[in-house]
Amino acid sequence: MGMLKNGIPSEATLCRMEQGIDDVSMAKKMSEFIALFRQELNTSGKQDIISIDGKAMRGTMQSNGRNPDIVSAYSGQTGLILATVACSEKSNEIKAGSVLLGELDIAGDIITADAMSMQKDIIDKIREKGADFVIELKANQRSLRYGIEDRIGRCKPLQEYTEGPELSHGRIETRTYKVYDGEALIVDKEKWGGRLTVVEVISETINKSTGVRSTERRFFVSSLPPNARR
């Protein structure tokens, strides 16, 4: 078609060209393009659920011998990865999550994340940008988690509903959700910049092949009101 008048570039030429690309600038431009594309897809203006998650990149290695960790923001409504940040250490995921949130337009959306994101600076960033959050609570916030466990038995849930049973991955699972006003459960409420809702999830699982039953109890903290639509 006359596009490559001097022939196909050699492998070495292509490698030199790729090595000359500023990967940070390229990632920034890609994020800008995806933000515009997301606006085009979301013409209805519906609330999006954005998941922040970190994954180790297998099959590649840094100079320190570790697999790099990539923290990404995924849009549940459009199916797009909105932005990514690479971390040299697992512990840097907290900082990377805050950087991601600073780059994204999340006003009116809901941010979901694992327990590592239950940090004051991340919560403040989400509230500051006009979004809500649902974040899992584990022992990394020990006083908060154990305080809720101590008090929750004396509180009545404002909402309670059950999903299942469902068969998945060889297990039959039934989940019960209990929604509480965090006012009575959280001691250091001022630290988190506003009202919080606590969600208790009780998963009862039966292994289909062995019949073994197990129960798991998890907690989530949210800025959404207790009566928010499911």
Which positions does each model-derived feature cover?
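Active-site- or DNA-interface-adjacent structural scaffold in DNA-acting proteins
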Residues: 4-63
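Active-site-proximal loop/turn and secondary-structure-junction residues that shape catalytic pockets
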Residues: 56-58, 117, 139-141
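Electropositive, glycine- and tryptophan-enriched low-complexity nucleic-acid-binding patches
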Residues: 63-108
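Short, conserved catalytic/metal-binding motifs centered on acidic residues
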Residues: 10, 50-55, 73, 79, ...
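An anionic, glycine-rich sequence signature occurring as long contiguous blocks
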Residues: 138-230
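Short acidic, glycine/serine/threonine-rich loops at helix termini
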Residues: 61-64, 121-125, 145-149
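Domain-level cores of phosphate- or acyl-group-handling catalytic modules
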Residues: 94, 98-138
